[in-house]
């Protein structure tokens, strides 16, 4: 779990997302409250439930990106799902309980990786020993008059020399034959609602078939070392302990990001005739958000302390169109602002992995030096903003379209311009995009 303070979390988010201070503060406080709750003594700790967040704002302003970056900072089980993928129980489609099942799978993978990191150095030593056993078989018993001690000393000295060469990578390209455990056979079974437990038993029965069998393979030592390290680390893990920790991690620290929640409101679905009732999805989501127990293959998982962050553009609907019970489960509401020309300019250059840096790095691989003048950046931002105003407002995503169109010719012929410098200024931008950005019909289809 992350121990960062809210200010540190906001500072990290600022490296990747421009503006939206209110939303950043809300998620930073929510994340910090997970840590604070863990410090509270037990009877009261169970009563402290997370305050779920509803983010409201047009598309392309950073709602999903905030959630994505938060997942990396949280060091906790995190899943992002679209509310539109789910249907009311009884209809064809995914039911909402699968959210928790997917989350627990992510948690198990996360926990297993964390536990494997703890034993990796010991596993690496054992993997090295196995490779050295292949390269340097143990000497046969020495006959009459032989000096067994002397032979062992020689063998140990040779082993240490080979171990040093192995660690320095001098033996990486040498091939060895080794016996590796075959991975268990994966099998997916479509399960009707309520029959998950039975299908899990069938799946585990099939996965056990063939487990423990060895397969002889010829691989390079570099790959062999990795494969054997993973195999040795897996042997050291206690799978039951991993599952218990994973379930506990989901229950105490899990975060679910529900995107497009505005698309399942009743107003958004008026006059839809025979379409699946989206209001039914809201009713199915309600117990999950309120706190319920979901049956998974790793055991029962309580959702009482899972943090839910919902987001939606709410163009055609209002938050009040959600059913009242669900509205009450998202007490913290944050409105995200539309992006200005200055925001677009900052997105292009001010973030850690800005679009400008990405394209410069891509073209540098072909020895083309791409430079952006300040007036060129400003003009790009103005065009992106203007096209959003005139056509559909898709927020920062418009920049991808505009810059891709701008650099289309440079990217296409980069191989013929190795060692050259290309400067993107306002004149270059107008020459490449002027006609398209001015003509509304053209910009509708091209940008």
Curated annotation (Swiss-Prot):
Compartment(s) where it occurs, according to its Swiss-Prot or TrEMBL record: Cytoplasm
Domain of life: Bacteria
Gene: hslU
Keywords: ATP-binding, Chaperone, Cytoplasm, Nucleotide-binding
InterPro entries on file: AAA+_ATPase (IPR003593), ATP-dep_Clp_protease_ClpX (IPR050052), ATPase_AAA_core (IPR003959), Clp_ATPase_C (IPR019489), HslU (IPR004491), P-loop_NTPase (IPR027417)
Subunit composition and interactions: A double ring-shaped homohexamer of HslV is capped on each side by a ring-shaped HslU homohexamer. The assembly of the HslU/HslV complex is dependent on binding of ATP.
Family: Belongs to the ClpX chaperone family. HslU subfamily.
One BP annotation, GO: proteolysis involved in protein catabolic process
Name used for this protein in its record: ATP-dependent protease ATPase subunit HslU
Transmembrane domains' residue ranges: none
Positions bound to ATP: 18, 60-65, 259, 325, 397
NCBIfam families registered for this protein in UniProt: hslU, PRK05201.1
Organism for this UniProt entry: Burkholderia cenocepacia (strain ATCC BAA-245 / DSM 16553 / LMG 16656 / NCTC 13227 / J2315 / CF5610)
Gene Ontology cellular component terms for the protein in this record: HslUV protease complex
UniProt KW ATP-binding keyword: yes
Biological role stated in the UniProt entry: ATPase subunit of a proteasome-like degradation complex; this subunit has chaperone activity. The binding of ATP and its subsequent hydrolysis by HslU are essential for unfolding of protein substrates subsequently hydrolyzed by HslV. HslU recognizes the N-terminal part of its protein substrates and unfolds these before they are guided to HslV for hydrolysis.
HAMAP family found in the cross-reference section: HslU (MF_00249)
GO molecular function: ATP binding; ATP hydrolysis activity; peptidase activity; proteasome-activating activity
């Amino acid at each position: 779990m992350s121990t960062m303070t809210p200010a540190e979390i906001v500072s990290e988010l600022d490296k990747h997302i421009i503006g939206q201070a209110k939303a950043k503060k809300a998620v930073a406080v929510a994340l910090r409250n997970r840590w604070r709750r863990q410090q509270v003594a037990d009877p009261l700790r169970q009563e402290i439930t997370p305050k779920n967040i509803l983010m409201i704002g047009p598309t392309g302003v950073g709602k999903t990106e905030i959630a994505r970056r938060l997942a990396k900072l949280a060091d906790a089980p995190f899943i992002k799902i679209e509310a539109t993928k789910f249907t009311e129980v009884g209809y064809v489609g995914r039911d909402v309980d699968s959210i928790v099942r997917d989350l627990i799978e992510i948690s198990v993978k996360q926990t297993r990786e964390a536990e494997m990191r703890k034993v990796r150095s010991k596993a690496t030593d054992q993997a090295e020993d196995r490779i050295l056993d292949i390269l340097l078989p143990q000497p046969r018993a020495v006959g009459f008059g032989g000096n067994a001690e002397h032979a062992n000393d020689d063998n140990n000295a040779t082993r240490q020399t080979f171990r040093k060469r192995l660690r320095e990578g001098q033996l990486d390209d040498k091939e060895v034959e080794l016996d590796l455990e075959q991975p268990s056979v994966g099998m997916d079974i479509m399960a009707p609602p309520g029959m998950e437990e039975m299908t899990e038993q069938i799946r585990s029965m099939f996965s056990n078939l063939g487990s423990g069998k060895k397969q002889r393979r010829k691989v390079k030592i570099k790959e062999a070392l990795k494969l054997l390290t993973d195999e040795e680390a897996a042997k050291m893990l206690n799978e039951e302990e991993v599952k218990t920790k994973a379930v506990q991690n989901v229950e105490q620290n899990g975060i679910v990001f529900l995107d497009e929640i505005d698309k399942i409101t009743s107003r958004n679905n008026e006059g839809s005739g025979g379409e699946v009732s989206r209001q039914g999805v809201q009713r199915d989501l309600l117990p999950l958000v309120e706190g319920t127990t979901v049956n998974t293959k790793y055991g029962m998982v309580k959702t009482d302390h899972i943090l839910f962050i919902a987001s939606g553009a709410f163009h055609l609907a209002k938050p009040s169109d959600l059913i009242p019970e669900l509205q009450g489960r998202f007490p913290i509401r944050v409105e995200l602002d539309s992006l200005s020309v200055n925001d677009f300019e900052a997105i292009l250059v001010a973030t850690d992995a800005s679009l400008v840096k990405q394209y410069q790095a891509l073209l540098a691989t072909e020895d083309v030096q791409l430079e952006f003048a300040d007036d060129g950046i400003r003009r790009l931002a103005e065009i992106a903003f203007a096209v959003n105003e005139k056509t559909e407002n898709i927020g920062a995503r418009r920049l991808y379209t505009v810059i891709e169109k701008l650099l289309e010719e440079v990217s296409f012929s980069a191989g013929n311009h190795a060692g050259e410098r290309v400067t993107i200024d306002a004149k270059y931008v107008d020459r490449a995009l002027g006609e398209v950005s001015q003509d509304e019909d053209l910009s509708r289809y091209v940008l």
